[in-house]
A protein has these predicted regions:
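Generic helix-packing signal
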Residues: 17, 39-42
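C-terminal catalytic/substrate-binding lobe primarily of soluble NAD(P)-dependent oxidoreductases
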Residues: 41-189
Length: 189
């Protein structure tokens, strides 16, 4: 993730004869490609992407493994979530609008708002309703809200024993090994 609007970098990339491929993971990325494919085939009035990489083996307390940098996951929980409702961009708090959803062979997962639409907010702006929700095992939202409330995801540095540390950086460092998906650990997306 980077905070800049990738579409605003188009002219800079052209000027430097560079091809930049952004938002090209699972979501955003594969979800954008699937939406683009169907957009060519039919009129779309509503698009909802539900995504979450989860470990098959659930381990307390987080029951989560990050297939990418933990700091990016944690920032996803603090960055306002944008989606489209009735052709207007709406902004809500991340982790909001929680719902429980049942999946065959997986069980119940919780879903919540995250800011994953990114570039398709603009490239697919003709679709009147679009939303992305992240999926986690039940209880994850409450754990993350506790970390937020306690200040563990703050970006402003604090002083500890004469050292300046970032609570978010510190938390990410602690979670790095706990959230690392091992080479033989199974996960599903």
């Amino acid at each position: 993730f980077f905070p800049e609007d990738a579409l605003k970098l188009t002219e800079l990339a052209k000027k430097n004869n560079v091809t930049a491929i952004v938002d090209c993971g699972v979501a955003p990325g594969m979800s954008n490609l699937i939406l683009g494919y169907h957009n060519e085939k039919m009129k779309i009035d509503s698009f909802e992407c539900m995504v979450g990489g989860l470990p098959k083996k659930r381990t307390q307390p987080f029951e989560y493994k990050a297939p990418f940098s933990p700091i990016d996951v944690l920032e996803e929980y603090t960055r306002p979530a944008r989606y489209v409702e009735n052709s207007c961009i709406v902004t809500k708090t991340a982790l909001s609008d929680a719902e429980f959803i049942d999946f065959n062979k997986v069980g119940t997962l919780e879903s919540f708002n995250t800011d994953g639409l990114r570039s398709i907010l603009f490239t697919m702006g003709h679709i009147p309703n679009m939303k992305e929700k992240t999926l986690r095992y039940p209880g994850h939202i409450d754990l993350m809200k506790s970390l937020i409330k306690a200040g563990f995801l703050n970006t402003e540095a604090i002083q500890y024993k004469g050292q300046s540390i970032s609570p978010l950086g510190f938390t990410s460092a602690l979670l790095f090994d706990q959230w690392k998906l091992g080479a033989t650990e199974a996960e599903f997306t």
